[in-house]
Regions:
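Residue-level detector of bioactive/disordered segments in secreted/extracellular proteins
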Residues: 16, 43, 162-163
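Hydrophobic h-region of N-terminal signal peptides that target proteins for export
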Residues: 8-17
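Processing junctions and N-termini across compartments
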Residues: 12, 28, 35, 154-155
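Mature, soluble, non-transmembrane domains
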Residues: 98-210
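Positively charged n-region of N-terminal signal peptides that target proteins for export
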Residues: 1-4
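N-terminal Sec/ER secretory leader and immediately downstream segment
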Residues: 19-97
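The N-terminal extracellular segments of secreted preproproteins, especially immediately downstream
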Residues: 13, 33, 40, 159-160
Length: 212
C-alpha cells in the first residue's frame, strides 16, 4: 500500500507540469479587411483582392509575464501582408501599447505578444499611445488616439454559429468562445507597416477570450 501511495505522490509533479496554467487572459477583438462571414460569391470576390490587413486588440484582465503583472494593460497590433492573411505570406506588424503601462509592462507585453503570436510576423515598430478598450455585452470599442479605432458589434442571434459553413477564416490567434462580429467601422491612420486604410459595415471581425 505504501508503495502505491509513494508512486502516486511521485506522479503529482509530472501531472502539474503536463497541465500548465495560462499566464495571461482577457478580451480580444480583431478586424480584417475582408468579410469573414459571407456567401461563397462574396468570399471568392475578395479572397485574392483584399484581406491583406488586420487590426488586433487585447485587453489583459489578469496574469503575469516574466514575473511582471500585466493586468489592465491594453495593446493593438496592425498587421499587413502582400497577400490575403489566410495565405500565410510574409507579414509585418506594428504594436501600439497603452501609454499608461510602465516601461517594464510595455517590454513584457511586447515580449508576450511576439513569443506567442506568430501571426504578427515581423514586428517592425512599437508605439505608445493612450489605448482604450471598452467591452460591453457584445459591443467592442477600441482606440489608440488618432492612430487606430475600431467598433464591433456581435451578430444578431449568433448567425455565425447557425451557419458555420459561411465562416471562411479563422481568427489570427486562438480564442475561447470565438464569435464573428459586425464591423461598424475600423480606421488606421498609417504608419510603419502600411498606408492608412478604413472599412465599415461588414462582417469582418472575430472576438472572444484569449489565454496564453
Amino acid at each position: 500500500m505504501k508503495k502505491f501511495l509513494l508512486a502516486g505522490l511521485l506522479l503529482l509533479p509530472c501531472l502539474s507540469e503536463a497541465q500548465p496554467r495560462p499566464s495571461l487572459s482577457g478580451d480580444y477583438v480583431e478586424v480584417r479587411t475582408a468579410s469573414v462571414f459571407a456567401g461563397a460569391c462574396h468570399f471568392n470576390g475578395e479572397v485574392v483582392t483584399t484581406g491583406r490587413d488586420a487590426m488586433m486588440a487585447w485587453n489583459v484582465q489578469s496574469g503575469r509575464w516574466r514575473g511582471i503583472s500585466l493586468a489592465g494593460v491594453r495593446a493593438i497590433a496592425v498587421v499587413s501582408s502582400e497577400a490575403n492573411l489566410a495565405d500565410k505570406a510574409l507579414r509585418r506588424s506594428e504594436l501600439i501599447i497603452d501609454s499608461g503601462a510602465s516601461e517594464a509592462q510595455t517590454g513584457a507585453m511586447v515580449d508576450a505578444l511576439k513569443e506567442n503570436y506568430g501571426a504578427l510576423g515581423k514586428v517592425v515598430s512599437v508605439r505608445r499611445a493612450p489605448v482604450k478598450f471598452e467591452h460591453t455585452g457584445k459591443s467592442y470599442l477600441v482606440s489608440a488616439g488618432e492612430i487606430a479605432t475600431l467598433s464591433v458589434e456581435g451578430m444578431p442571434n449568433d448567425e455565425c454559429c447557425k451557419m458555420p459553413h459561411q465562416v471562411w477564416y479563422e481568427p489570427l490567434v486562438p480564442l475561447m468562445h470565438r464569435k464573428v462580429g459586425y464591423t461598424k467601422g475600423v480606421q488606421y491612420s498609417g504608419g510603419s507597416v502600411a498606408e492608412g486604410w478604413q472599412r465599415a459595415d461588414e462582417n469582418s471581425a472575430f472576438y472572444g477570450k484569449f489565454l496564453i
